[in-house]
């Protein structure tokens, strides 16, 4: 969408820049535009509901061909370009139906030319505004996902930030996932071509720091926020060998030690399996760790490689194909096991943290066929093979006794047992809650206890009615329940009109943007936000090496946003034991 006086005479080499040009685009005086003095380029976007959006802005070059399984290269537009930023960018390689359990979500544009940004800002934002910048990293088990997913529509978030008096700019980074973002072999290690998802994200953040001021953002006030694997990526960036290029972090259902298989074995094993399926291991002298294997896989057509990748992924996780390929220690992006880095205090200071989880994070990951303690022990031993039988017995008899868990569900309570509920809670704490608490304390300790840390537990779900109507209300406050609230898009995206649900979305969205703006926790405006929110370890006057026995976790939702002292006390006792284990 460009000015007519410069359209004529454009060289064919600028086709990528002008790829969506139409005659009507040339005469859209209402379209917002941004001039970037760094590249002397102009971006033409869209506007709706008081929010301006700029879509499909490339920060990296095409990752196909010789750039497959290689570090991202910056994309630099030709000077004086007029760039159409009104169309969503392509999703990075993944199935057109990313999740078999969700056949209604179908991607129509999948390409290796996918390293792009989605930027949104309040209407009429000036380049001099210096608004806080919130950068979103999506989840999806390190396997699927895109910045343009309808669940991440930023309009409601931006609108609420304006209403709340803390306007922000939103940026979502598109990056490689699955094998394309987490291939792992000796040859790739030697060329520093591992953890490419994180390298993509890093390049995207560098673009933001260099160019966001043209959009009215403050490059010195960046908050990263993400959910699931997105939160894990953020936590790993904090522990990376590189300078941390952001100032605050919001970790929703993810931590650096959420995964306990980060030595690269899983990704390497599955990389070899994909290579075999693609006939890239057929020669006797062609070993999986050789450069020949990488070169062979670079020649495989994208769709064939995606198919082979997810055949292997679904052999690891038959339901979703998650985490067959995942972040791994490489000495470059991830210098060591995250638990070791946190224990040694090798973490940067002055990164403010807001982190939390949903009450029933693991309910959809634990089979309802668990009826007894023996069933529970068998499941836990399979999921966590490094835990011995005596430790599992201690968990199930002392720390997670069935007497602590009831089946008080309004929907078919007979479908689950106390043993299932205990197992769900234990799985949640092993994979997420206790690692989050340990990481939060380690980050606070690294700053000599001067950096604020806030924790929360979500106790309400926008999906409750749908779950009850489907007969699975016992699943409770499921994973991903926080995302619709944070983006404040219940009505537009999920057709949820309940006033109380939408009120919580407005308040939660307001608190997230307030945190990013530095106005957190907005005690004086509790009706517009979640109100008073005490620091997790705010009562400790002395900075101790040992984690305190008590922590403040804000309950969000049905309890009127109050802490539940008894439950948090039990949680800390359980985490005190879990965080001493190696598993």
From Swiss-Prot:
Pathway named in the protein's UniProt entry: Secondary metabolite biosynthesis
UniProt keywords, alphabetically: Glycoprotein, Signal
InterPro entries reported for this sequence: AB_hydrolase_fold, CarbesteraseB, Type-B_Carboxylest/Lipase
Signal peptide span: 1-23
Gene knockout outcome: Alters the ratio of the 2 atropisomers of viriditoxin by favoring the production of the P form instead of the M form.
Glycosylation sites: 84, 109, 221, 265, 307, 350, 388, 448, 468
One biological process term in Gene Ontology: (M)-viriditoxin biosynthetic process
PANTHER family, alphabetized: CARBOXYLESTERASE (PTHR11559)
Family: Belongs to the type-B carboxylesterase/lipase family.
Function field: Inactive carboxylesterase-like protein; part of the gene cluster that mediates the biosynthesis of viriditoxin, one of the 'classical' secondary metabolites produced by fungi and that has antibacterial activity. The first step is performed by the polyketide synthase VdtA which condenses one acetyl-CoA and 6 malonyl-CoA units to form the heptaketide monomer backbone of viriditoxin. The product of VdtA is then O-methylated on C7 by the O-methyltransferase VdtC. The O-methyl group is important for the stereoselective coupling of the monomers at the final step of viriditoxin biosynthesis.
UniProt name for this protein: Inactive carboxylesterase-like protein VdtD
Biological source species: Byssochlamys spectabilis
Lineage of producing organism: Eukaryota, Fungi, Dikarya, Ascomycota, Pezizomycotina
């Amino acid at each position: 969408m460009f000015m007519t006086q410069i359209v004529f005479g454009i060289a064919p080499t600028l086709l990528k820049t002008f790829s969506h040009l139409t005659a009507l685009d040339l005469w859209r005086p209402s379209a917002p535009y941004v001039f970037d003095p760094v590249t002397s380029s102009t971006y033409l976007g869209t506007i709706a509901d008081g929010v301006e959006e700029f879509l499909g802005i490339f920060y990296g070059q095409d990752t196909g061909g010789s750039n497959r399984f290689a570090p991202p290269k910056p994309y630099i537009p030709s000077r004086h370009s007029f760039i159409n930023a009104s169309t969503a960018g392509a999703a990075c390689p993944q199935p057109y139906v990313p999740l078999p359990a969700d056949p209604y979500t179908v991607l129509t544009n999948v390409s290796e030319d996918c390293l792009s940004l989605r930027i949104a800002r309040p209407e009429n934002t000036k380049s001099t505004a210096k608004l806080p910048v919130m950068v979103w990293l999506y989840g999806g088990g390190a396997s699927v996902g895109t910045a343009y997913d309808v669940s991440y529509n930023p309009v409601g978030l931006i609108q609420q930030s304006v209403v709340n008096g803390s306007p922000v700019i939103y940026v979502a980074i598109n990056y490689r996932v699955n094998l394309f973002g987490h291939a792992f072999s000796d040859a790739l290690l030697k060329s520093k071509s591992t953890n490419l998802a994180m390298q993509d994200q890093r390049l995207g953040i560098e673009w933001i720091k260099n160019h966001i001021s043209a959009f009215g953002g403050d490059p010195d006030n960046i908050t990263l926020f993400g959910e699931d694997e997105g939160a894990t990526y953020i936590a790993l960036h904090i522990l990376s060998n590189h300078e941390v290029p952001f100032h605050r972090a919001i970790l929703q259902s993810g931590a650096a030690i959420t995964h306990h298989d980060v030595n690269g074995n899983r990704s390497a094993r599955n990389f070899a399996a994909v290579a075999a399926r693609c006939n890239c291991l057929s020669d006797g002298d062609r070993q999986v760790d050789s450069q020949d294997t990488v070169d062979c896989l670079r020649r495989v057509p994208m769709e064939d490689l995606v198919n082979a990748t997810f055949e292997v992924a679904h052999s690891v996780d038959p339901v979703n194909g998650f985490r067959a390929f995942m972040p791994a220690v490489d000495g470059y992006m991830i210098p060591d096991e995250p638990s070791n880095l946190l224990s040694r205090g090798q973490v940067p200071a002055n990164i403010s943290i807001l982190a939390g989880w949903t009450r029933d994070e693991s309910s959809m990951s634990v089979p309802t066929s668990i009826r007894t303690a023996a069933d529970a022990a068998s499941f836990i031993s399979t999921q966590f093979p490094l835990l011995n039988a005596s430790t599992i017995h201690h968990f199930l008899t002392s720390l997670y006794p069935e007497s602590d868990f009831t089946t008080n569900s309004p929907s078919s309570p007979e479908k689950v047992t106390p043993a299932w509920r205990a197992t769900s809670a234990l799985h949640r704490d092993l994979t997420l809650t206790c690692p989050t608490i340990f990481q939060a304390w380690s980050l606070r300790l690294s700053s000599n206890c001067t950096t604020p840390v806030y924790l929360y537990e979500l106790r309400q779900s926008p999906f409750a009615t749908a779950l009850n109507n489907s007969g699975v209300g016992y699943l409770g406050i499921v994973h991903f329940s926080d995302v619709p609230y944070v983006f404040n898009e219940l009505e537009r995206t999920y057709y949820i009109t309940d006033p109380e649900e939408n009120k919580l979305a407005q308040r939660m969205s307001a608190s997230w943007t307030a945190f990013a703006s530095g106005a957190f926790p907005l005690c004086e405006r509790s009706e517009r936000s979640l109100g008073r929110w005490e620091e997790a370890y705010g009562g400790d006057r002395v900075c101790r090496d040992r984690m305190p026995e008590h922590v403040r976790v804000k309950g969000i939702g049905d309890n009127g946003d109050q802490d539940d002292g008894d439950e948090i006390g039990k949680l800390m006792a359980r985490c005190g034991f879990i965080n001493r284990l190696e598993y």
